[in-house]
């Protein structure tokens, strides 16, 4: 298995092997927290209008997002902390600036994974078992390319998968961003 790091969102859109979308600070960590809380139904959307339309037909979903919604539209912040307080029985909908857009940008991939430092070792163990190539996608490619955390994490994950590097050192680098 080869492990590559995406440099452009166009690379993601045509990749057909495995993709890992990395969003260190928000969406991946929020989604991981929702799943850890026991949620069995977590859906992602690429834009607010589609999320609003879905929620109107499915009012049982709790929306997690940092984006602007129509006035009066109830939603939680795209926050791992808010997700940690979530009711496990309520389905969730997540729409974000970069992470969920990156997931939709990866539609051609055979398998799509999401993560960051929150599930680094579990993700690495899973990826080591794959035979097909892996493209690591910093979600910042789909929004603010200045988000250094995503790039630090994909570099650390690539190094770790190739048998060198130390995730804890990368976490310390993130603390300095």
Model-predicted regions and their roles:
Residues 9-12, 19-33:
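Short acidic, Gly/Ser-rich segments with clustered Asp/Glu that frequently serve as metal-coordination loops
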Residues 22-29, 46-49, 97, 118, ...:
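Conserved active-site and cofactor/substrate-binding residues in soluble primary-metabolism enzymes
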Residues 34-39, 55-61, 74-80:
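Glycine-rich loop at the start of a catalytic domain that most often binds anionic cofactors/ligands
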Residues 126-134:
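Glycine-rich phosphate/diphosphate-binding loops that line cofactor/substrate pockets in enzymes
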């Amino acid at each position: 298995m080869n492990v590559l790091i995406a440099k452009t969102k166009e690379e993601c859109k045509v990749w057909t092997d495995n993709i890992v979308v990395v969003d260190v600070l928000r969406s991946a960590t929020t989604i991981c927290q929702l799943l850890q809380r026991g949620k069995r139904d977590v859906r992602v959307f690429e834009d607010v209008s589609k999320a609003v339309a879905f929620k109107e037909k499915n009012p049982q979903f709790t929306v997690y997002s940092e984006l602007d919604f129509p006035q009066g539209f109830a939603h939680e912040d795209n926050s791992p902390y808010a997700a940690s307080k979530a009711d496990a029985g309520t389905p969730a909908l997540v729409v974000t600036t970069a992470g969920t857009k990156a997931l939709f940008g990866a539609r051609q991939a055979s398998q799509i994974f999401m993560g960051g430092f929150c599930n680094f070792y579990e993700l690495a163990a899973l990826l080591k078992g794959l035979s097909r190539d892996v493209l690591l996608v910093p979600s910042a490619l789909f929004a603010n390319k200045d988000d250094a955390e995503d790039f630090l994490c994909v570099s650390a994950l690539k190094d770790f998968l190739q048998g060198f590097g130390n995730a804890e050192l990368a976490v310390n680098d993130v603390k300095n961003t």
